[in-house]
């Protein structure tokens, strides 16, 4: 077993090591800042699957996210499901934010209001820089499927959306590909040409570092 001092030294070295966030699904910062934040904001992405597995119904999920309902009512409805999922990796990530970013020991009856207020307070321009660059020491983020959205900070890179060229099984997808390439599709040859134009556009973009299917 490593000594306490060795553990501390290793943790300090890890904290000071710049990292690459190799898989992100972050929206552009501007629209994110327009969205009201509260305790449930931390659980709306990957944790949703765990909540459903813990027994949350469609009605529960809708109520958790319904800002027209009193915050306390939403918390009381959410609380038993948090108890069921809190040891899972996704919930632990959310609770790390509560502890290390927001400064609360845990998300509880006595802190859900404060956590909600603090999440809203920090939801201001520069949020990504403060959390990703300054707090997490991230040198680059690789964003999935958001190539034509933005703007993003200059340390964001992109995985191009592979379905644009491989998932063209219906008319809507064909029309979308045609519009993006400004090239009509009336034959298989036209489709292949649009696929090639799309891939060439990705290859020419220095912010594109790969393709995600």
Q: What role is predicted for each listed range?
A:
Residues 2-213:
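Metal-cofactor-binding active-site regions of metalloenzymes
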């Amino acid at each position: 077993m490593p000594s306490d001092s060795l553990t501390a030294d290793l943790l300090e070295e890890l904290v000071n090591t710049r990292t690459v966030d190799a898989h992100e699904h972050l929206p552009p910062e501007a629209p994110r800042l327009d969205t009201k934040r509260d305790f449930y904001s931390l659980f709306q992405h990957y944790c949703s699957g765990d909540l459903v597995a813990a027994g949350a119904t469609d009605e529960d999920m809708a109520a958790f996210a319904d800002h027209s309902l009193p915050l306390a009512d939403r918390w009381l409805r959410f609380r038993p499901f948090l108890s069921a999922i809190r040891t899972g990796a996704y919930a632990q990530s959310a609770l790390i934010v509560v502890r290390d970013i927001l400064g609360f020991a845990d998300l509880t009856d006595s802190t859900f209001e404060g956590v909600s207020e603090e999440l809203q307070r920090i939801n201001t321009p520069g949020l990504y820089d403060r959390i990703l660059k300054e707090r997490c020491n991230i040198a680059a983020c690789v964003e999935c499927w958001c190539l034509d959205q933005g703007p993003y900070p200059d340390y964001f890179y992109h995985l191009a959306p592979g379905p644009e060229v491989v998932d063209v099984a219906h008319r809507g997808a064909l029309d979308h590909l045609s519009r993006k390439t400004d090239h009509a599709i009336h034959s298989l040859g036209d489709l292949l040409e649009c696929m090639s134009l799309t891939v060439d556009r990705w290859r020419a973009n220095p912010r594109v570092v790969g393709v995600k299917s």
